[in-house]
Amino acid sequence: MITRAELLDMLASNAPQGFEAQALGLVPIVVETSGRGERSYDIYSRLLKERLVFMVGEVNDQTANLVVAQLLFLESENPDKDISLYINSPGGSVSAGMAIYDTMQFIKPDVSTLCMGLAASMGAFLLASGAKGKRFALPNSRVMIHQPLGGARGQASDIEIQAREILYLKERLNNLLAQHTGQDVERIARDTDRDNFMSSDDAKAYGLIDQVLLKRP
């Protein structure tokens, strides 16, 4: 098992020149000491032990795979204890986002959501999809909802197929968002016709979140 001194020596020996400029790309290491010795974790693995999952950046297949795997793992560890999903995302793939959404609804533990920074597009949808009463945002967060984006090229028949699919997805997302916010589907359709940015207080009034957190409860 690696000791604290060995870990620090390893980091020092591998540190590149111009370290200050590159340090932001490093994942911090946490070293815990117990009666059995010392153990090192990257910071995200350590927070996963506290049932905290991070969804940061674009929602794509890789992001979805990581988030889904963590949700399923935490359910297997304790099916009765809440999971917290921290979101700072501009959105992304609808299919990847729906994989996360379906898993959130499928597993037994409640999934609490919290927006820090930005929850836009699919990020906002997943924010609103958390367990009722357990959806939060920090005071300077921004939330943005809009209709799904898409494009098609090729033969007219292929474009028609893609157009039908994106219209189906739009209707499906609007219905789910209405279910989670309490708004009627017609209003959701109007409000998502173009990019619709909200403050955390606006998001609360709209039903996307339940509470704006100024301090940890």
Curated annotation (Swiss-Prot):
Q: What does this protein do?
A: Cleaves peptides in various proteins in a process that requires ATP hydrolysis. Has a chymotrypsin-like activity. Plays a major role in the degradation of misfolded proteins.
Superkingdom? Bacteria
Major location (coarse): cytoplasm
For this protein, the Enzyme Commission number is 3.4.21.92
Q: Does this UniProt record's set of keywords contain Protease?
A: yes
* GO MF annotation list: ATP-dependent peptidase activity; ATPase binding; serine-type endopeptidase activity
Q: Identify the InterPro entries for this entry.
A: ClpP (IPR001907), ClpP/crotonase-like_dom_sf (IPR029045), ClpP/TepA (IPR023562), ClpP_His_AS (IPR033135), ClpP_Ser_AS (IPR018215)
A cellular component annotation (GO) from this entry: cytoplasm
Q: How does it assemble?
A: Fourteen ClpP subunits assemble into 2 heptameric rings which stack back to back to give a disk-like structure with a central cavity, resembling the structure of eukaryotic proteasomes.
Active site, per annotation: 121, 146
Q: What is this protein called?
A: ATP-dependent Clp protease proteolytic subunit
Identify its protein family: Belongs to the peptidase S14 family.
What gene does the UniProt entry assign to this protein? clpP
Where does it live in the cell? Cytoplasm
Which residues, by range, are in coiled-coil regions?
Answer: none
Which EC class heads this enzyme's classification?
A: hydrolase
Q: Which organism is it from?
A: Burkholderia vietnamiensis (strain G4 / LMG 22486) (Burkholderia cepacia (strain R1808))
Classification via Pfam families: CLP_protease (PF00574)
Q: Quick one: a GO biological-process term for this protein?
A: protein quality control for misfolded or incompletely synthesized proteins
Give yes or no: UniProt keyword Disulfide bond.
no
Reactions performed catalytically: Hydrolysis of proteins to small peptides in the presence of ATP and magnesium. alpha-casein is the usual test substrate. In the absence of ATP, only oligopeptides shorter than five residues are hydrolyzed (such as succinyl-Leu-Tyr-|-NHMec, and Leu-Tyr-Leu-|-Tyr-Trp, in which cleavage of the -Tyr-|-Leu- and -Tyr-|-Trp bonds also occurs)
The alphabetical list of record keywords is: Cytoplasm, Hydrolase, Protease, Serine protease
Phylogenetic placement of the source organism? Bacteria, Pseudomonadati, Pseudomonadota, Betaproteobacteria, Burkholderiales
